[in-house]
């Protein structure tokens, strides 16, 4: 290679930085900043300080930063949430749910930066998915992908696009090639739109096979017991009419009644109160279905109690809602040397030995489904267990019997507030059940009861009650779900009148958690007696008390030391009362500012006006105003009109993104100045010349950028690759616009690694995905889009034909399933069952599990000569009947 020691140093330390970032040891913002400082330390022989610092003032980067302000202003008004809730409507299948959710997001993210777009869409899709009965995991990865795909349709759709636009402008303006410097807002659309459409098509066609169900990151395909509550909506109904058989990710493998276990029950079986159903599925799904249909979770202890007729005392093993309570669920795997192997679950003294109670066990492992207590334990079995006060992870017995680390799965004892919300007359929840309104199944949120306007009450167990105007819904919620509840359209806090009387402008209002001091002056008094609003100019919205659910009426609660108050107050309130003797801890609740709906129209119009300045300028090939000052002026108007406050604007900026992009600019300047970029560009030039095709060179640029995007962030990948691609493009006489398009598409193609893109990371956490689940859909998606990009880049001159074919194919694939719903229900169920079998047949994990199960069963048969995999101790209790 034709570069000296400067190039060698640049390559070596840049490669080291890639390793550090790929291993996630240090974030890209810090890594690139340190790398850039190091490269400037050679007296300007690698890169001068001036060139290294130039990236911090790049107009493309400044545009990215100030567009965060615009997005924050729109989000704070709640306008986009109302629009998206209207657009989403209702859906009857995963196919239509994806079509309804992905396409609007793609359109929206073409003009609004995809990161804030995903931020406000996550809670909307979670609630909407629950209302439609669609597994949340089927929606959140496509949400991230849709926001990325939509962002490739315009030059302002993603921060990466803006970065590349800025780099192109700076490069060719400096070279006095002004005709090549400008990249208009829709210059990428002829290529980005087909790219997005074919990505959309891939998700629709493969969702049944590649997208995960509504599961956690931990054990899947569990055997879980649930009890039909007396008030359940499925009681006295046939199994086929109950709605349980239509639930995705949930199947009934058996039913226990009157001392008998019925395996594979007939769909005509009539369910009775206190029946125990044995569900095969994933914990989150089963828990949601249980809440939806009135089924209580049954652990091993409760299952034992249910073997005898219920008496008054024995019913206490269930909570008032009918389920066995759990504190903190953990997952454990039976070790190969465990003395539990060969014993049934009922024969183990779980609480005495481990301080644990079995809740569920992973199916398979060479045995048929049965009752939880009758399962014969084997090496490798994965159990979900509840913890008791006597649980100690470091106990020697636990270490000897469980392989590896016992992992926490779910906390059932999280801090809980009881919040009352009143239903407005115009609310969309009116005349809907609690489930249909989207208020069931939301993580951290549980409906307790409904107080009707006439003074009567409806318990949460009444699953058929339809909400009416002026009803008060009492909800138990953890702090994470409070923000969702505060922004739910058509609901307002019961304490809203008290909140309004504080006089605090909605612009500066948020929530704070305040822990009551044990020796404070408000202990032993009610909120009303304290005259809390008058004394503190704040309103108590809810109260949490450890180990107890406090009464619903906030004003009449007698405060105790250790109570945690949820307070609506001014943003400065926590600082002003930091040393107040009434409280020992004050903690603001993130993202708890109420939506400024009265400013919704203003916010949307201002953002639309900003986008129109770029659209009109692009159509007339004239820049009336650069997007950077346009974004700043739009944000200023949003501040003046009360769409957001200054603190919210400051916090909206992702400074790690700024530092990453700016430093990456400097590193790319170092690679270009030392000749490293030119050396790598020669490889791309050789590909183009050897294949006599500009398209081949552009494909090489796309693939190299996409691979780099999986290792780094999308912005860093674009900044590093741009000088390399630009040199190659100039040598091959490729238009700078076409070169930039290849980099823009490639830099956004971070689909396999959830940590490679900010949008991926947000849905990864919200959906509780595993890295493997991302890779299963992301790897084939990446390959598919490489093929699509190859065609698009090779036929850039024929983009009109590519557009027509893409739109026609997309329309056909989206609309063709509409014919499915014209078929009779029985035929639909048969088709669904067929595709479920196909999906299971093609699932590599299930194929391996089936083979291992057959091998284990054959091994056991050979060793005991019985030809059966069941232990004698598991037989006879209870009697098993096959329908």
Curated annotation (Swiss-Prot):
Keyword Kinase: no
InterPro entries on file: Cit_transptr-like_dom (IPR004680), DASS-Related_Transporters (IPR051679), RCK_C (IPR006037), RCK_C_sf (IPR036721)
GO biological process: potassium ion transport
Domain named RCK C-terminal: residues: 211-295, 317-401, 406-491, 497-583
Segments crossing the lipid bilayer: 3-23, 30-50, 60-80, 106-126, 139-159, 185-205, 600-620, 624-644, 657-677, 693-713, 774-794, 802-822
GO cellular component, one term: plasma membrane
Induction: Up-regulated by sulfur deprivation.
Record's subcellular location: Cell membrane
Claim: Nucleus is one of the keywords in the record: no
Primary localisation category: membrane
Disordered: annotated span: 857-883
Keywords: Cell membrane, Membrane, Repeat, Stress response, Sulfate transport, Symport, Transmembrane, Transmembrane helix, Transport
Compositionally biased residues, Low complexity: 861-871
Parts forming coiled coils: none
Gene inactivation effect: No effect on sulfate uptake, due to the redundancy with SLT1 and SULTR2. Slt1 and slt2, as well as slt1 and sultr2 double mutants show a 50% decline in uptake while the slt1, slt2 and sultr2 triple mutant exhibits no increase in sulfate uptake capacity when deprived of sulfur. Modified regulation of the SLT3 gene that becomes up-regulated by sulfur deprivation instead of down-regulated as in wild-type.
A GO MF label: symporter activity
Membrane topology term: Multi-pass membrane protein
Function: Na(+)/sulfate cotransporter with a probable high-affinity for sulfate and a proteasome dependent turnover.
Protein family per UniProt: Belongs to the divalent anion:Na+ symporter (DASS) superfamily. Na+/sulfate symporter (TC 2.A.47.4) family.
The protein's name in its UniProt record: Sodium/sulfate cotransporter 2
Lineage, opening ranks: Eukaryota, Viridiplantae, Chlorophyta, core chlorophytes, Chlorophyceae
Gene name of the record: SLT2
């Amino acid at each position: 290679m034709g570069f000296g020691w400067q190039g060698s140093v640049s390559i070596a330390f840049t490669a080291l930085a890639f390793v550090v970032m790929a291993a996630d040891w240090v974030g890209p913002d810090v890594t690139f900043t340190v790398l850039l400082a190091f490269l400037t330390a050679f007296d300007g022989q690698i890169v001068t300080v001036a060139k290294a610092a130039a990236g911090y003032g790049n107009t493309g980067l400044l545009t990215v930063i100030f567009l965060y302000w615009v997005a924050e202003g729109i989000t704070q008004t709640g306008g986009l949430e109302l629009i998206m809730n209207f657009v989403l409507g209702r859906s009857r299948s995963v196919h239509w749910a994806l079509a309804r959710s992905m396409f609007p997001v793609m359109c929206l993210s073409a003009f609004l930066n995809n990161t804030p777009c995903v931020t406000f869409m996550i809670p909307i899709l979670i609630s909407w998915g629950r209302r439609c009965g669609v597994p949340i995991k089927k929606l959140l990865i496509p949400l991230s992908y849709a926001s990325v795909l939509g962002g490739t349709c315009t030059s302002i759709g993603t921060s990466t696009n803006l970065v590349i636009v800025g780099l192109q402008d700076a490069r060719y303006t400096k070279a006095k090639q002004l005709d090549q410097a400008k990249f208009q807002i829709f210059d990428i659309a002829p290529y980005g739109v087909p790219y997005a459409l074919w990505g959309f098509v891939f998700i629709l066609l493969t969702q049944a096979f590649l997208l995960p169900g509504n599961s956690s990151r931990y054990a899947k395909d569990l055997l879980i017991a649930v009890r039909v509550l007396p008030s359940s909506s499925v009681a006295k109904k046939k199994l086929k009419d109950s709605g349980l058989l239509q639930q995705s990710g949930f199947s009934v493998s058996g039913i226990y009644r009157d001392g008998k276990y019925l395996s594979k029950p007939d769909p005509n079986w009539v369910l009775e109160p206190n029946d125990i159903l044995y569900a095969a599925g994933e914990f989150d799904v089963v828990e949601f279905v249980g809440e939806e249909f009135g089924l209580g979770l049954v652990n091993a202890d409760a299952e034992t109690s249910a073997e005898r007729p219920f008496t008054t005392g024995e019913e206490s093993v269930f909570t008032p809602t009918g389920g066995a309570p759990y504190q903190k669920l953990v997952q454990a795997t039976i070790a190969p040397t465990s003395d539990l192997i060969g014993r049934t679950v009922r024969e183990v003294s779980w609480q005495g030995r481990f301080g644990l109670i079995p809740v569920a066990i992973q199916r398979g492992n060479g045995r048929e489904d049965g009752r939880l207590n009758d399962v014969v334990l084997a090496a490798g079995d994965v159990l979900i267990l509840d913890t008791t006060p006597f649980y100690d992870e470091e106990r020697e017995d636990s270490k000897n019997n469980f392989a590896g680390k016992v992992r926490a799965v779910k906390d059932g004892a999280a801090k809980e507030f009881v919040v009352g919300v009143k239903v407005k007359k115009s609310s969309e929840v009116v005349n809907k059940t609690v489930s249909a309104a989207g208020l069931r199944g939301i993580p951290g949120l549980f409906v307790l009861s409904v107080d009707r306007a006439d003074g009567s009450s409806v318990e949460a167990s009444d699953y058929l009650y339809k909400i009416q105007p002026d009803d008060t819904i009492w909800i138990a919620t953890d702090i994470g779900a409070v923000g969702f509840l505060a922004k739910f359209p058509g609901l307002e806090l019961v304490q809203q009148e008290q909140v309004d009387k504080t006089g605090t402008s909605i612009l500066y209002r948020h929530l704070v958690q305040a822990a009551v001091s044990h020796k404070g002056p408000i202990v032993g008094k009610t909120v009303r007696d304290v005259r809390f609003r008058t004394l503190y100019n704040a309103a108590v919205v809810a109260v949490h008390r450890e180990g107890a659910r406090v009464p619903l009426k906030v004003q009449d609660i007698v405060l105790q030391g250790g109570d945690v108050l949820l307070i609506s107050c001014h943003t400065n309130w926590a600082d002003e009362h930091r040393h107040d003797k009434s409280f020992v801890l004050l903690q603001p609740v993130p993202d708890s500012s109420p939506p400024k709906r009265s400013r919704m129209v203003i916010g949307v119009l201002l953002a639309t006006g900003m986008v129109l300045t770029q659209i009109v300028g692009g159509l007339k090939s004239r820049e009336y105003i650069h997007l950077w000052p346009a974004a700043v002026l739009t944000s200023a108007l949003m501040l003046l009109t009360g769409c957001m406050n200054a603190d919210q604007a400051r916090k909206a900026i992702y400074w790690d993104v700024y530092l990453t992009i700016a430093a990456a600019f400097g590193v790319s300047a170092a690679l270009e100045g030392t000749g490293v970029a030119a050396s790598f560009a020669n490889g791309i030039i050789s590909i183009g010349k050897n294949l006599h095709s500009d398209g081949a060179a552009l494909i090489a640029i796309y693939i190299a950028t996409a691979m780099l995007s999986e290792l780094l962030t999308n912005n860093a990948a674009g900044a590093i690759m741009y000088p390399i691609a630009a040199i190659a493009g100039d040598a091959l006489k490729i238009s700078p616009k076409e070169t930039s398009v290849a980099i823009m598409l490639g830099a956004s193609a971070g689909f396999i690694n959830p940590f490679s893109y900010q949008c991926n990371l947000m849905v990864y956490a919200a959906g509780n995905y595993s890295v493997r689940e991302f890779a299963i859909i992301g790897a084939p998606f990446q390959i598919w889009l490489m093929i699509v990009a190859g065609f698009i880049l090779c036929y850039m001159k024929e983009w009109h034909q590519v557009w027509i074919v893409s739109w026609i194919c997309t329309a056909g694939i989206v609309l063709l399933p509409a014919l499915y719903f014209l078929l009779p229900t029985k035929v639909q169920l048969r088709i669904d069952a067929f595709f479920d079998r196909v999906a299971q047949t093609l699932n590599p994990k299930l194929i391996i599990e089936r083979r291992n199960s057959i091998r284990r069963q054959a091994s056991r048969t050979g060793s005991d000569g019985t030809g059966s995999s069941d232990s004698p101790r598991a037989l006879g209790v209870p009697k098993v009947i096959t329908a």
